[in-house]
Design a protein with these regions (language model features):
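C-terminal ends and interior cores of transmembrane alpha-helices
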Residues: 56-74, 277-292
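Cytoplasmic membrane-interface "Motif A"-like loop-to-helix N-cap segments
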Residues: 44-55, 265-277
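Helix-to-loop junctions at the C-terminal end of transmembrane segments
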Residues: 35-47, 256-268
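Hydrophobic core of transmembrane alpha-helices in multi-pass small-molecule transporters
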Residues: 75-94, 296-311
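Glycine-rich segments within core transmembrane alpha-helices of 12-TM secondary carriers
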Residues: 93, 114-139, 161, 336-348
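Multi-pass alpha-helical transporter architecture, strongest
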Residues: 165-172, 370-391
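C-terminal transmembrane helical hairpin of 12-TM major facilitator-type secondary transporters
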Residues: 269-315
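Extracytoplasmic gate region of multi-pass secondary transporters
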Residues: 200-252, 345-348
Length: 391
């Protein structure tokens, strides 16, 4: 898509991917701002209204991305408009993190926070799977049919889902825990200021424990397929790789819910620490097998990565949300999630491509995963029982 909007077909595959992933990363830089804005709305006026506004803004940005003329029609304005739309989309996505606060506040005494928190992650996994399937369909369009309208189909599908989401959220009731809180106390005037003044430690911990999740999520969902098909120089069939990737993402969704439920029994901290060690240990073998001309090895690589990644993904939402009391939870969780995303997640495909480019070593991206696995493990190790808030 970026090639259509920037008017260039880059022969250098590294330059092409770096450009594409740079546009992808732009939206992540806007997410913390969106988290602060919608966090203020969610903590002061209610979770429901914040979630409605965020999905409406998301749908607006998707609409404009869908109708942007290509470079041949409006020149330099095409990539400029794309970046603006990505920024708006990033702001909206920053507000979407509050879904987690909304979900776990339906739990009684926090007994199934891990399971409920995993549902939000499951929706993201399903969304990624749907996006991959739609992209696979658009690959069947060739020539002018793709240039003129084929590339717009994924955005049309996204807009359709956005409209459905707005309708569903209008019918949802406010979370019981927030309603009880609002009956007993007056909501804070500036949740963001209170967060930075009184909750620096849990805020920093939430950012750091989420880094390995954000890093791994975007490597699995965005980078792996491009790495296998284009950057690793394998001679495998692209269509088969897309099927393997889609199946892997589907399995990841199932395992995520399982590990979320498991964490309610054995502890979120314990599950995530073991999973972080697992990701550290498998990173180098995974990138090595994914660069081989063997479908069996590629499948093994996906399995090796997906199991520990799902174990991080399942409990992470609840583990982060429980670090904040209800009066700043929407703001605290949203900002932590999106700062972590901007630091470790959104730029992951770009950094991994750059690492291969400067080192000419196919397993170089493993160092990026291993770095964040260590950081998140250390952050998890210092969390104590007194840091946890359960409604």
């Amino acid at each position: 898509m970026s090639d259509l909007l920037n008017g260039k077909t880059l022969e250098d595959k590294y330059s092409s991917f770096i450009l594409t992933f740079s546009v992808f990363a732009v939206g992540f830089l806007a997410r913390p701002f969106g988290a602060a804005v919608f966090g203020h709305i969610g903590d002061k006026y209610g979770r429901k209204i914040a979630l409605i506004f965020s999905i409406v803004l998301m749908s607006i940005s998707i609409t404009f991305m869908m109708i942007i003329p290509v470079y041949n029609n409006i020149g330099i304005y095409a990539p400029i408009l794309l970046v603006i739309c990505r920024v708006i989309q990033g702001i909206a996505l920053g507000g979407e993190a509050g879904n987690v606060a909304f979900l776990i506040e339906h739990s009684k005494n926090g007994k199934n926070n891990g399971l409920l928190g995993s549902y939000e992650v499951l929706s993201a996994v399903i969304g990624s799977l749907m996006a991959m399937l739609v992209i696979m369909i658009t690959h069947h369009f060739t020539g002018n049919s793709f240039v003129i309208w084929g590339w717009r189909i994924p955005f049309f599908v996204g807009l359709f889902i956005g409209v459905i989401s707005v309708c569903l959220r209008l019918r949802n009731a406010e979370s019981p825990a927030y309603c009880m809180y609002k009956e007993q106390k007056i909501p804070l005037k500036l949740p963001f200021a209170v967060l930075l003044k009184n909750y620096k430690r849990p805020f920093l911990l939430a950012i750091l424990i989420d880094c390995i999740e954000n890093c791994s999520f975007h490597i699995l969902m965005v980078f792996f397929v491009n790495f296998i098909n284009e950057l690793s120089l394998t001679r495998v069939d692209h269509h088969c790789i897309n099927i393997i990737a889609s199946t892997g993402i589907f399995v990841c969704g199932i395992l995520t819910v399982y590990f979320g439920a498991l964490s309610d029994f054995v502890g979120k901290k314990k599950v995530m620490m073991i999973a972080s060690i697992g990701l550290f240990c498998v990173s180098i073998p995974v990138f090595w097998v994914l660069s081989q001309d063997s479908y069996i090895l590629i499948i093994i690589g996906y399995i090796l990565f997906i199991i520990p990644f799902s174990a991080v993904l399942g409990p992470v939402n609840a583990a982060m949300a429980e670090l904040f009391p209800i009066n700043i939870r929407y703001t605290g969780f949203g900002l932590a999630r999106n700062i972590s995303s901007a630091i470790a997640g959104g730029g992951a495909p770009l950094i991994c491509t750059w690492l291969i480019y400067i080192t000419d070593i196919k397993i170089a991206p493993a160092m990026y995963v291993m770095f964040w696995a260590i950081i998140s493990y250390i952050a998890l190790s210092v969390i104590q029982k007194k840091d946890i808030y359960v409604d």
